[in-house]
């Protein structure tokens, strides 16, 4: 139901308390708990309504995390709900809202060379303002999620993902598959710090390394010089039409992560990757569907949405080739296996 004129007039006069001009408000239990666990943001204040504490386990988790973070907590009643609604931009907040600094997103010019024994991924940062340095820091490397010995790093590059819900869903999928970093083209994608993106990601964005890419074409060119293998996600018919490119399909491909560090480029739903990025790929990757056996059931749905496509693609990239032995990190034979499969 649409808000009445009186409701809109009332909301216009509801003031929101900000600790800093750059403060953001995270809403929803899963997102707030994820942010408190990840500890990657500055935490200013937690607003919590009694209805958010009806689940004893959730209430205990919030109390423990607030104590660990030395976070100021304000218990509010129904009179504060108009402010909570405005903080959450009218979206469901479950009675819990966290005021924080923005999520770190590293403006990145290039990924560095990745050596056989490297446990992190070198990066070259673009210029940052003093305010950005306060949020992001000034690192020269990012973590490699070195859980299994058979694979090298995977970075997911997103171009043209304008829908905040799609972006959030992709971030959630990337976290599920332990992607090492998500690189977001800043001029063509929705802002990652939108609260609706964080909500759609269900807290997964808090655990991801996120790179902002101001110059994606130069980024890809330099990464290739540093030994990164670049793949473009394309429709199957587009893959076959691209002469001179190696064309892979998720159903039968051997993961390129067994050979070297890789970047997987994902384009906009419908339009796909921009040509200036697609032409830089070393190989194309497509997803083949299965045609209905009964012609009457073929209603013309011949593709997946971008979120579903990313899930299928990442499963293929993270699928260990059958001919490779794998040892989970921390076992005695880790170094021996790592040396043998590179």
Task: Indicate residue ranges for each PLM-predicted region.
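N-terminal positively charged helical leader segments and presequences
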Residues: 1-124, 334-339
């Amino acid at each position: 139901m649409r808000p009445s004129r009186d409701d809109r007039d009332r909301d216009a006069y509801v003031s929101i308390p900000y600790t800093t001009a750059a403060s953001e408000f995270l809403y929803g239990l899963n997102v707030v708990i994820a942010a408190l666990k990840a500890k990657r943001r500055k935490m200013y204040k937690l607003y919590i309504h009694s209805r958010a504490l009806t689940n004893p386990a959730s209430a205990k988790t919030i109390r423990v995390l607030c104590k660990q973070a030395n976070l100021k907590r304000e218990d509010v009643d129904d009179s504060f709900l108009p402010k909570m609604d405005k903080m959450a931009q009218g979206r469901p907040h479950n009675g819990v809202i966290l005021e924080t600094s923005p999520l770190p997103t590293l403006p990145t010019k290039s990924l560095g060379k990745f050596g056989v024994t490297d446990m992190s991924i070198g990066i070259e940062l673009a210029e940052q303002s003093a305010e950005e340095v306060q949020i992001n820091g000034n690192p020269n490397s990012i973590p490699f999620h070195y859980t299994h010995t058979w694979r090298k790093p995977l970075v997911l590059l997103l171009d043209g993902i304008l829908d905040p819900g799609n972006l959030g869903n992709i971030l959630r999928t990337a976290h599920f598959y332990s992607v090492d970093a998500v690189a977001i083209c800043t001029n063509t994608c929705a802002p990652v710090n939108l609260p609706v993106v964080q909500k759609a990601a269900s807290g997964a964005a808090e655990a991801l390394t996120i790179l902002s890419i101001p110059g994606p074409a130069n980024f890809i060119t330099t990464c290739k010089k540093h030994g990164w293998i670049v793949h473009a996600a394309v429709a199957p018919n587009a893959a076959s039409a691209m002469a001179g490119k190696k064309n892979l399909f998720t159903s039968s491909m051997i993961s390129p992560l067994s050979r070297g560090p890789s970047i997987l480029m994902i384009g906009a739903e419908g339009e796909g990757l921009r040509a200036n990025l697609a032409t830089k790929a070393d190989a194309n990757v497509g997803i083949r569907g299965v045609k209905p056996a009964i012609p009457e059931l073929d209603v013309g749905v011949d593709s997946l949405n971008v979120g579903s496509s990313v899930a299928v693609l990442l499963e293929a990239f993270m699928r260990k080739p059958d001919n490779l032995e794998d040892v989970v990190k921390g076992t005695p034979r880790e170094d021996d296996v790592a040396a043998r499969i590179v």
